[in-house]
Structure formats: structure tokens, C-alpha cells
Amino acid sequence: MKKQLLAALIGGSLLAPMAASAADYVIDREGAHASITFKVSHLGYSYVVGRFNDFSGDFSYDAKNPTAAKVNVKVNTLSVDSNHAERDKHIRSGDFLNTAKFAEATFVSTSVEDKGNGDMVITGNFTLNGVTKPLAIQAHAVGEGQDPWGGYRAGFTGTTTFAMKDYGIKMDLGPASANVELDLVVEGVRK
């Protein structure tokens, strides 16, 4: 009995630091240290580039155990900004984002694959235009550490591509413009 109790205490004390080492972060939107940008081919000749100005989210991350990471992001699709007011109005319409009906896009991670050297694949459920489908983000841990204000930060980049038709966007701009590339820059402040 004493041996079992001792083994349980030792085992528990060894596992406790591992369980406590994952940290929760909130995406730093106030300091403008995060961005969600997109790029779509314009007829195969150039690109339309834009961003979402309003989004929020949080994540849990432990550099020693990246596969346990969790990510949750909400994007206000009304905040789309392609640097052209008339185009933004069209992007918000039923032809594309249908923001009158679906004013929010979300990403909730379901798994993280550690690729080594800070690289990972974050897979999750992406909801856009009322459609939810799995989406994989190629991500990289940029770094983490103390900031000058007494907080602790962790930063990441990510990229992914999806087909508009997969999310019920039926506007046909031709094959060169069928996909959207998303680029993500995320800096989180430890809660």
C-alpha cells in the first residue's frame, strides 16, 4: 500500500509540470500585432489583396508539446477590407461572403501535427458562409518570451488555401480565381 501511494505521488509530481506547462493566450488585437490577410487571383493577371480588420481569438500552446495546442478564432466578415469600397460591398454581398446572413467566420482546431523546428499543421473546422469544413493551416512558431511590459507573448505565422465553391460561394470568376489564400500573423498575450 505504501509503495503504491509513493508511486502515485512520484508519478503525479512528474506529470504535474507537464500538465501545467501549456499556456493560454489571447490574440493581441489591441496592439495590432495580428493580421488575417487574403489574396485571390484577379483573372490570372494579378491579385486582389485584402484583410479582415475585426477578429478575435485565443489559443493554448506548449512548445514542448505542440500537438496539445488548441486554437479558436472568430472573424467579423463585415470587416473585410480590400482597399476598394465598391469591391468590399460586392464581397459582402450574397455573391461572396453573404454577411447579411453570415456575419461571422470561425476556426476551431481539432488536431495539431508537429513537423519539427516550430513547424506544424493545425487542422480544424472552418465555418464560412454558413458552411463548415475541415481546413489545414501550415503554421510556424516564430518565438515566445517576456515583453517589456511584464507580459509573456508567443507568435506564429500560418498559411492556407481553400476553394470558394467548397464554402457555398458560387460566383464564378474563372478557374484562375477559384481559390483564396489566407495568410495569418498571430501574436498572443498570455492570460
Swiss-Prot record:
It is found in: Periplasm. The keyword Aminoacyl-tRNA synthetase does not apply. InterPro entries: Lipid/polyisoprenoid-bd_YceI (IPR007372), TTHA0802/YceI-like_sf (IPR036761), UPF0312/YceI (IPR023480). Residues 1-22 form the signal peptide. SMART domains: YceI. Keywords: Periplasm, Signal. Pfam families: YceI (PF04264). Its main location: periplasm. It comes from the Bacteria. GO terms for cellular component: periplasmic space. Belongs to the UPF0312 family. Type 1 subfamily. This is UPF0312 protein Shewana3_1179. It comes from Shewanella sp. (strain ANA-3).
